[in-house]
Each structure stands twice: as structure tokens, then as C-alpha cells.
Amino acid sequence: MKNYLKDIGFAAFLLVLAVLLLLSLFWALSIGTVKLPAGDIYDAVLHQFTSGMPIEATGQGPVHDIVWLLRLPRLILAALVGAGLASCGVIMQAIVKNPLADPYILGISSGASLGATSAILLGVGAALGPNFVGIAAFIGAFVISLAVLFISNLGGRSNSMKLLLAGMALSAVCGAFSSFIVYFANNKEGMQTIAYWMMGSLAGAQWGELAVIAPIIVASILFFWTQSRVLNLMLLGDESAITMGTDLHAYRQWYLLISSLIVGFAVYSAGMIGFVGLIVPHVIRMFTGPDHKRLLPVAALVGAIFLVVADGLCRVIIPHTELPIGILISMIGAPSFIYLMIKKTYGFGGSD
């Protein structure tokens, strides 16, 4: 009975977070260069659902265009990317048993960045179609994930420390190659695109893009949620897991590959946005503890709320100018992480 009541309380907490996410979406819809009253937003949403017209259809009014074509796609993308990066942070930290781990430290984001940089400045993969930059970013993340797994398996079976070291080494290599390409590139327009992309932006979100990204990120998060028992065993270590009948070797590899899928699409859609996968799990673990059955859904919802609110702030902090979201996240994330590092130990949910 006590566990049942405990589960009911946790479900209520998730419901509260879901409501907060909806409220943050509504708030972010209303702010910007053009402020929209709540009534106008409600009318635009209701009209779209009752009219039966395609979202992209012209002649539906300026409020409809602002809500459905400009703001709502980017806010949904912000929620998806925030949830995906926060969830990947949880997974990375479990894989290497280190709360400082995130997709960046294991080289996945750097691989995606190298792929996108090669596509934009060198035209690599242009034959793949108009979305070749995104495809190149995903391929870069996926290839680096495979390389991390390959290197960590050299000289015997991989473990969390070998994965961490392999990821850090490959991250440095990808960064060096990206810098090399940028340094010798003679493409001013491409350089501007890279600079803007490296700072992170959600402005280019499209409904067609969301139709591809949303199922992948949501399905991956739900899959990881079903793996809570294995993720909890990873915190105990390989020897303890083996005595309990679970070999973690294959699980680590699959989790890393699925995480690369999320990160590849996130980097393709929103550019380089750091700290979400590092800060959000670190903070949430203080409240939920290390149990991934609770940690994962809370981290996903909080990550979504965090990025939606950040995107809203980016549009109003500087009048008539949109601040790149990666800059704002770094300005918030870096001092927050330093504070957490001083106040808390690096244990999974532990404190001084």
C-alpha cells in the first residue's frame, strides 16, 4: 500500500510538470516582438483545429501565421530537443558512472558538429538532398559512437572508464578536424552559417521536420524508461551486475547508439546547445534520487520546460534582437554547474 501511494504521488508530480510544460508553451507563444493576448492565441489554435485547413495555407491571418508557422514549431522543437538532451545526459551518466558525463564528453555532439561542418563548408553529402546537413550531422554522431565502442573494446571488453576516455579523445579529434575545415574554408556564407549554427538556434523549425524528429525522440525516451532496471544496475558496476545475472556490455553499446540517434537529430535541428544534458540530470537527481524509473521522466519534462522557457527569453532579453539560445544556455549553465560542483559531491544523488 505504501509503494502504491508513493507511485500515486509520483504520477501526480509528473502531471504537475506536464501542466507546467503546457503553461510555459503558452507563455512563450505570447511573447516576442509582437505580443499576443491570450484570447488571440486561443482563437488561432481553435480556428486551426476546427477549420480543417492545412497549417501552411495562406490567408488565415497574421496571428495564425505567428502562432502556427513561426512560434509553435520552434517551441515544440525546443521541448523535444530539451527532453532528448536531458534524457541522453541521464543515459551517458549511467553508462560511465559519472554525473559529469553528457553527449559532449563522449564525443557524440562533436561528431555531429564535424558532420554538419563538413556538409556546410565542403558540400559533403550534397547529393543526399536538401536535408543533407542534417543527415551528415546524424552520420557524424553515429560514426563517432561506433568509433567510441570500437576503441573501448580494444585490448579486452569495454567498461565505463574506457568508454569515457575513448569519447574524450575522439571529441578532441573531431574538434581539431572541424577547426581545420573552418580555418581553410573559403566560403563566407558557409562561415556565417556555421557560426550561427554553432551558437544554437530554433528559428528554422518546420512542421515537416518535426514530423520526423518527434517520433524518434519520444520513442527513444520511452525505450530508455523501460530500461530503468538495467540503468540502475550500471550504477552498481559490472561485477555486481553479473552476480545478479545481467551482462552490461551489450546494453552500453545499444544505449550509446540510440543516444547518438537523439543527439544527431537534436544537433541537426537546433545546432550546438550545451549544458542541458549535464545540468538537468544533475539537478533532478538531487530530488528524485538515482532510481532511473523516476529520474528519466522527470529529467525529460524538466529539460523540455527549461529549453522552452530559454527560447522565450531569447526573444525578449534584447529588444528587437534574438539572442542565440546556445549563448543563453551557456550563460545560465556554466555558473549553475560551478555552484552545484561546490555545494554537492559528484555522487549519484549524494551530498556532503
Where are these regions (language model features)?
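Alpha-helical transmembrane segments in inner-membrane proteins
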Residues: M1-D352
